[in-house]
Amino acid sequence: TPDATLPVNSIVTPNGSSSIVEGGTTAGTNWFHSFDRFNLPTGSTVLFDNAATIQNIFSRVTGNSISNIDGLIRANGTANLFLLNPNGILFGNNAQRDLGGSFFASTADRIMFADGGQFSTLGAGETPDAPLLSITAPIGLQFNRGNAGIIQANGSQLSVPKGQTLALIGGEIHLNRANGDRISPIAQLWAPSGRIDLIALWEGEWGLDGTLLQSPLTPDRPP
């Protein structure tokens, strides 16, 4: 369900068990979406219908519920997809990706950009940051609250194309069997000739290049 926090708001058009995400706010080669809730029921499909020029798709959840993903997420071309929900993200047994780029799922509070811009999930007391949406590349994720949500994959089979990154970055990362028993397969992750990041971070900043930028146990980053 889209919210109304962007200059151009997201539009979700349902068609049977499928949905198409359009609208959103474009800044250079970045495409921003904002949702009050983001869930994908079993057997359903959502397509982020991006233009061929888009390199990064950013989607955030500003409401208070976790995201339950148990269907197929698609995007066009080689765009990277970022899903940000500080409440938590649950990937079910039927969760799949059909992406040409990398996939980042995180319970961080905000995405940081090279020019100092941020894409925040609008925590308590914050104001919408839509006018500051950046045209530059994303460089990291920031955890401010000290109680980041959990990312859980229950028998999921998550993959990205050759040479891309599959990243799950949250307060805790749980890779479980589909039914919680000893027979069902455990969650499986694939990134052939690429990179898989499983990062548990309650507070601090994590660089998208795979480095810790700042934590309560490290000094502040240099200016």
Task: Please identify what each model-predicted range represents.
Residues T1-P223:
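Extracellular and secretory-pathway beta-repeat/beta-biased strand scaffolds
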